[in-house]
Every structure is written in C-alpha cells, then in structure tokens.
C-alpha cells in the first residue's frame, strides 16, 4: 500500500439533490432509502478501518440528525456541503454567506464543533465565484474541496492547479483541495468519482489513482449515498434520467473496497493538516464583503 495518504469523501445528501430530479416526496420511503444507503456505506468503511469526510448538506443534517451524530461519534469528519444545495452561480455574496452560515450552525449544534471543510454543490466554485473564498475564510473554514480542474460543461476550471493551493483573502486563508483529474492525450479527465467510477472498470480507477500518487499528489475521491443503494431509483424525469442515475451503481461498493485495499484513505482534513509548503494565491476583495 502506498504511504501517501488519499482523501475519502462522501457528499451526504438525498439522491434527488445530486441528480436534480423531480421525485415523489414520500418521506418514509426516502428515510428508508437513506438508512439503507448509509448502513451499507458504514459497513464498507468499518470493514476497511477507514474514516472519511462526509460533506453534509445542512437540510439533510436536519432531516437525519441521528446519522450525523453517529458518523461523528465513530470518527468520521463532518464537513459542510452548504445548506440548500444551491449552485454558487445562482447566489450573491449575501445569500451565499447566509447559506454557509446556516449549514455550519446546523452541524455545530449536532456535533458540538464547527466544520473545518466546505464543498460547493455541483462543484460550482468556478472562475467567476472567487469571491466565495473570502466568505468561507471569514466563516472560519480551513479548507474547501470545491474545484474540479477540468473544462466541464456546467462546472470546472480547466487551467486550475491540480495540486492543493493555499488561498489568501482579506478575511483569512484556507486551502483548496481540488478533485482529482488525470491528463490523457493533452486533455484533463475527471477521475474522482461519480460517473467515472460508475461507468469504468475498477482497474481504470486504480491506474488513475496510482498515476496521481506517482506525481506526489493525494487522490481526492467523492461518492454519494445513492450510488451505494442496491435498490433502483426512479424519478419523474423520464427514461434517460432514470438510466443515468442507476448506471453502474451495483459496482460502486466493490470498487470502493478494491481501492481501500490498495491505497491509504483518510479524511480530507487529515491530508490538509499534513500539507507542507504549497503554492499560494491571493484573492483580493471582489464583492465578497457583506
């Protein structure tokens, strides 16, 4: 097993938040599905002796407080995914600060400590949202893991550094831990989780992580609870959307077990705490003061 530590993370939310589906609001069915998904995730992590970062959506934490307390008590890091799962691109600085602050308060009330980390919904911290860093720093956050350094259609920054970056703002400093990508024939390929993990063979994930490790970088992975659900998920958005949300989910648990046997995974905050000297970028006030 490589001595380099890698980042394990789960974006903790109900599945319709992730895939933007219209779904029937049967609260009992949702609770049963969430319990089923989290029990499976917990079993995999316990089996491997791995602890990870759960980026908890604020309203999800409100809905399932027992799970937040349980995961925290078992040694997992509870970070924030914002409160309402709104893209930063749809928020102004005032609304963004309110969303982040509300999520921090919800989690702090449940675990007795304020989260250290933040992940933007839909990885929506893009080139036009650099002002968000000053707000995150001002709220006391130590790191963000929000940037996908590839030119995606709806998110991503194609020329963003692929290694951790220290971001200095007038309100404080924090670290950006970008999601993992690899260069393939001159183009960046997102390999951190989601569709790539569901659609590709586990060997492809291993090769990507090994390549990143050889470059001296930690592999930053992410998954969602619904990707561990053995039961089919259905929305009102038609056949194509249902096909997408169910694609490859049956293989995710085995792929994660496979990766845990070959790489050392820890919470994101543990990797951040061990960073030495890394590049720094100053973000001047660009409208982030509220």
Report the location of each language-model feature.
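C-terminal domain-boundary segment and adjacent tail
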Residues: 47-48, 199-290
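Metal-dependent polysaccharide deacetylase catalytic core of the NodB/CE4 family, i.e.
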Residues: 48-129, 141, 146-153, 171-173, ...
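Generic structural signal for well-ordered alpha-helices
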Residues: 38-42, 65-69, 97-105, 133, ...
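Alpha-helix N-cap and loop-to-helix initiation/capping positions
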Residues: 25-33, 91-98, 196-200, 240-248
